[in-house]
Swiss-Prot record:
Required for the insertion and/or proper folding and/or complex formation of integral membrane proteins into the membrane. Involved in integration of membrane proteins that insert both dependently and independently of the Sec translocase complex, as well as at least some lipoproteins. Aids folding of multispanning membrane proteins. This is Membrane protein insertase YidC. GO terms for molecular function: membrane insertase activity. It holds the Pfam family YidC_periplas. Interacts with the Sec translocase complex via SecD. Specifically interacts with transmembrane segments of nascent integral membrane proteins during membrane integration. It comes from Geobacter sulfurreducens (strain ATCC 51573 / DSM 12127 / PCA). Belongs to the OXA1/ALB3/YidC family. Type 1 subfamily. It is found in: Cell inner membrane.
Length: 531
């Protein structure tokens, strides 16, 4: 088999298995009891900032938990006075399904009524997630440009006062939370303060949204995405994180450190089938009459690279573009840039495809020219094969002499194609995990560029264009090898059936442009030869 044929087949196989290995969603896990947690790195101790001492308070009588609602332009959130915790949070600008009437995306749900997120534990102060707080208001509405506060207060029998203050802004998806702890008792108290995120292992929403669901932590300038199967042998602890939370393909809920407020994040799988992320602060030790405060920031929103970057703490690293991030990020920014002018992400994809094709035109022209020259040498190459069929070493020497005589590079037709492979995978990443394409319509029946073509029209047309492209490509292969290569469009078509229609659109437009390019290149070469 010729070198080009072998390389093409190997690349196709690598593409197929590489896609399966790199981009397939992880297998679903069956909940099992969690083993004892193991800490990977020691947590760094940070001294919490002192705050003014509050007036000594008396323990409040036991009361039933109730809900407190807050409404902002970006989200609506329901708190429970049990723990002063977030009970439910819905994103108002994003919906579960495309089209009108879709339900809002829910990032915090009521699936686990005994463990609301974000919960708070401070065992040394007698505080657990069942403690009932007193709210400063029963409801709150935050308008565009406004900033408002909501506080929850709890007093222990020993005189320790804990106040959770949420600071809301009407301009985004972030909010600030401050824990103020005051020792109004007569004895010294100390405790770690733990913020607890609890999520169901199997979300009770559309499953495809959670195909990349799992814990995500950024620490030591590295993104840790702990797999559920790895938590079977014990919890994972990451020291001094900048942020930690849970992410799926398009959305993120995270706790962000503020001035060293996070000593460690520990993710474990509970026996009841939940993922629990415990974010520990430095130990708080308070003498009588002393108070301290810890501040965090919370984010509940889309994995939009610009939105995440505005939050700081390297939150944009939650978008894991893998090895091709250096190429994928500029492509993602270009996609948004052209959308701002066209108002249609499908058209933006077409524009980017045309630009990429123009950039690579010199390489493409060189590739087709090399293949055309190799095709003209086929009769002489076949003669050498027959002449030296029993002496492979002599045949290789004769082939190299033939190439040198005619100034032909035998791999000249392949190398330009290899250069374009990283660009394809980078664009794959940018399109596959871009929230901008989620529920973004193109035209006609394609109403969601992040979903597959519901009628499989575009992947089938794409397969047809691959066949046409192969027919137009100068061939150096014998009939048997050509038949093998003709199977590739079938393989690719089946692979692309369930790909996002935005990615299929790119590949289809790329094939059409390649056919046009090939036609003009072949014609220009034929014209030059005629002269």
């Amino acid at each position: 088999m010729e070198k080009r044929a072998l390389i093409a087949v190997v690349l196709s196989i690598l593409f197929f298995y590489g896609y399966t290995a790199l981009f397939s969603p992880p297998p679903k896990e069956t909940p099992k009891p969690v083993a004892t947690a193991t800490q990977s790195q020691p947590a760094q101790q940070v001294t919490a900032a002192p705050v003014p001492v509050a007036v000594p308070a008396q323990p409040q009588p036991a009361v039933a938990a109730r809900d407190v609602s807050v409404d902002t332009p970006a989200y609506s959130v329901t708190f429970s006075t049990q723990g002063g915790s977030i009970k439910r949070l819905d994103l108002k600008r994003y919906h579960e399904t495309a089209g009108p009437g879709g339900k809002n995306v829910t990032l915090v749900s009521e699936d686990n009524p005994s463990n609301y997120t974000i919960g708070l534990r401070a065992p040394g102060f007698g505080l657990d997630q069942n403690a009932v707080f007193v709210p400063s208001a029963d409801a709150l509405t935050v308008g565009p440009g406004e900033k408002k506060q909501l506080s929850f207060t709890w007093v222990s029998p020993a005189g320790v006062t804990v106040t959770k203050t949420y600071n809301f802004s009407g301009d985004g998806y972030g909010l600030e939370i401050q824990y103020q702890v005051t020792n109004s008792g007569s004895a010294r108290v100390s405790s770690p303060v733990q913020t607890v995120q609890t999520y169901p292992l199997v979300p009770k929403v559309k499953e495809s949204r959670f195909e990349t669901f799992g814990p995500a932590t950024f620490a030591q300038d590295k993104l840790f995405e702990d797999k559920v199967k790895d938590l079977e042998s014990g919890a994972k602890t990451h020291a001094a994180p900048l942020w930690s939370g849970f992410a799926d393909k398009y959305f993120l809920s995270a706790v962000l450190a503020h001035e060293g407020s996070m000593a460690a994040a520990t993710i474990r799988k509970t026996a009841s089938g939940y993922l629990e992320n415990t974010i520990s602060s430095p130990e708080l030790s308070l003498n009588p009459g002393e108070g301290r405060a810890l501040t965090y920031r919370l984010f509940f929103g889309p994995k939009d690279i610009d939105v995440l970057k505005a939050q700081g703490n390297s939150l944009e690293r939650a978008i894991n573009l893998g090895w091709f991030a250096m190429l994928a990020k500029p492509l993602l920014h270009s996609l948004k840039f052209f959308h701002n002018y066209t108002g249609n992400y499908g058209i933006a994809i077409i524009i980017i495809t045309v630009i990429i094709k123009v950039i690579f035109y010199p390489l493409t022209h060189s590739s087709y020219k090399s293949m055309k020259e190799m095709q003209k040498l086929q009769p002489k190459m076949q003669q050498l094969r027959e002449k030296y069929k029993n002496d492979r070493e002599a045949m290789n020497r004769a082939m190299m002499e033939l190439y040198q005589t005619h100034k032909v590079n035998p791999v000249g037709g392949c190398l330009p194609m290899l250069v374009q492979i990283p660009v394809f995978f980078a664009l794959y990443k940018a399109l596959m995990f871009s929230i901008e394409l989620r529920h973004a319509p193109f035209m006609l029946w394609i109403t969601d560029l992040a979903a597959k073509d519901p009628y499989y029209v575009t992947p089938i047309i794409m397969g047809v264009t691959m066949v046409i492209q192969q027919k137009m490509t100068p061939s150096q292969m014998d009939p048997v090898q050509q038949k093998m290569m003709m199977a590739l469009p079938v393989v690719f078509t089946f692979m692309f059936l369930n790909f996002p229609s935005g990615l299929v659109l790119y590949w289809l437009v790329n094939n059409v442009l390649t056919i046009i390019q090939q036609y003009y290149i072949n014609r220009s070469i034929s014209t030059a030869e005629a002269k």
